[in-house]
Design a protein with these regions (language model features):
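Membrane-helix boundary/helix-loop-helix interface segments in multi-pass membrane proteins
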Residues: 2-31, 37-177, 328, 338-353, ...
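Hydrophobic, glycine- and aromatic-enriched re-entrant/interface helices and adjoining loop segments
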Residues: 110-119, 123, 202-296, 314-322
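Interfacial segments of multi-pass membrane proteins
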Residues: 145, 183, 188-202, 267-292, ...
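Membrane-helix interface "capping/anchor" motifs
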Residues: 78-85, 151, 195-204, 316-317
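Juxtamembrane membrane-interface segments at transmembrane alpha-helix termini
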Residues: 97-110, 194-204, 214-224, 333-339
Length: 386
């Protein structure tokens, strides 16, 4: 049974909703342009240990935006129902790549970077398997939940099959190690299952079982404990653990109303690590000011609103569920990133969709947008509007 805010009957006859998909495409384009500008400003004076200069980050991101934009356009014009056939291969490929980064003999294509093995170098492109897994889990969960229908309310034949597949994927992401992405993938699967009608009681049981596991995962690494202490008790946390969050707040505060100007921020000069990715919202706050922060919030808020409107009136159950999941993929990721930047959440390393540097993240966000638009266009085919 679907939750009441999802309209199972779909849109009414002759309802022209083309403005929603057009506005969604426009929002994605604006966010990408905003992101390219922000990445350039955040990395303009950066030189990496490997000799890369900051402008290379913006150029690489721009190339990713072009490729992702082309793919999103093609997906927007395709039939989203085909993704049901691709769900199993996608989850299989994602799981395979997640295993590849953990194998002891694959360091050549999956090197250790910043203490973790999270990327696979395929020669012409470097891929982050957990980003692919994020998208694949949403599509796969939506596919299977749509097939199960009312059986989703049972545990053995409903929820258990999802756990058998999703739990190992989440576990592989955790082993990279990437706890924040593992939790995000679990949350996205939960959103789709909840929307499909899974019992709240089952989620409560999973919460009781999962809470000790989450505590154990945090306790398994000193840096995770430090991050949680920074959030819960900043005064008792090590100084190096509070540094990032403190500098993030300093940068946002320094921006005041209109910001210090594009490329003029000081926090990126060694004070705030990963100002172009993990903390790009802070860079926007410093260089674009309160006005820039509000613009970002409005853009993401409108994107999520449109995504749920598309989901509510999708032509079939799979379309409804995949639209909810992909909207949550963008919305939850943005909320986590912004929450960390404002010290409202422990540091996670979750990127800001469309904006943070990272071509895997950008590609997934654009692909998600393309599929969302496809769901929106599918409604018009269903209700007879050309």
């Amino acid at each position: 049974m679907l939750r009441p805010y999802i309209d199972r009957a779909g849109p009414g006859p002759m309802t022209d909703r083309r403005w929603e998909t057009r506005l969604l495409a426009l929002l994605a384009a604006v966010l990408v342009v905003f992101g390219l500008t922000a990445v350039y400003g955040a990395s303009s004076l950066l030189t990496t240990a490997g000799g890369q200069v900051g402008s290379e980050f913006a150029l690489r991101q721009a190339l990713g935006a072009v490729v992702g934009g082309i793919i999103a356009t093609l997906l927007a014009r395709s039939n989203y129902r085909r993704w049901q056939r691709y769900a199993w291969p996608m989850i299989g490929i994602a799981a395979f790549l997640l295993v590849v980064v953990l194998l002891p003999f694959t360091h050549r294509i999956a090197p250790t970077i910043n203490g973790g093995r999270r990327w696979v170098n395929l020669g012409i492109v470097t891929l982050q398997p957990s980003e692919l897994a994020k998208f694949a889990v949403v599509v796969w969960t939506a596919m299977l939940a749509a097939k199960k229908g009312e059986r989703i309310r049972t545990f053995q034949r409903g929820l258990l099959p999802f756990l058998v597949i999703i739990a190992p994927v989440v576990g592989l992401i955790f082993l990279e190690p990437n706890l924040s992405m593992a939790l995000l993938v679990a949350i996205l699967a939960g959103v789709v299952l909840f929307t499909a009608g899974a019992r709240i009681g089952h989620f409560l049981v999973l919460g009781v079982v999962g809470t000790p596991l989450a505590f154990g995962a945090v306790a398994s690494a000193q840096y995770r404990i430090a991050r949680v202490l920074t959030f819960l008790a900043p005064g008792s946390a090590p100084a190096e653990a509070t540094w990032q969050v403190h500098q993030s707040l300093v940068g946002i505060g320094a921006g005041r109303l209109f910001g210090v100007g594009l490329g003029q921020g000081q926090q990126k000069l060694g004070y705030l690590p990963y100002a172009y990715s993990d903390f790009i919202f802070s860079t926007i706050g410093e260089e674009w000011g309160f006005i820039g922060v509000v613009v970002i919030l409005v853009l993401f808020g409108t994107f999520v609103w449109l995504g749920f409107r598309i989901a509510r009136s999708a032509g079939d159950l799979f379309g409804q569920l995949v639209a909810v999941g992909l909207t949550a993929l963008i919305g939850v990721s943005a909320a986590l990133h912004i929450g960390v930047s404002l010290a409202l959440l422990p540091a996670t390393g979750v990127t800001l969709p469309f904006i943070s540097y990272g071509r895997s993240s950008l590609l997934v966000a654009l692909v998600a947008t393309g599929v969302l638009i496809s769901v929106g266009r599918g409604r018009r085919r269903t209700d007879g509007v050309a």
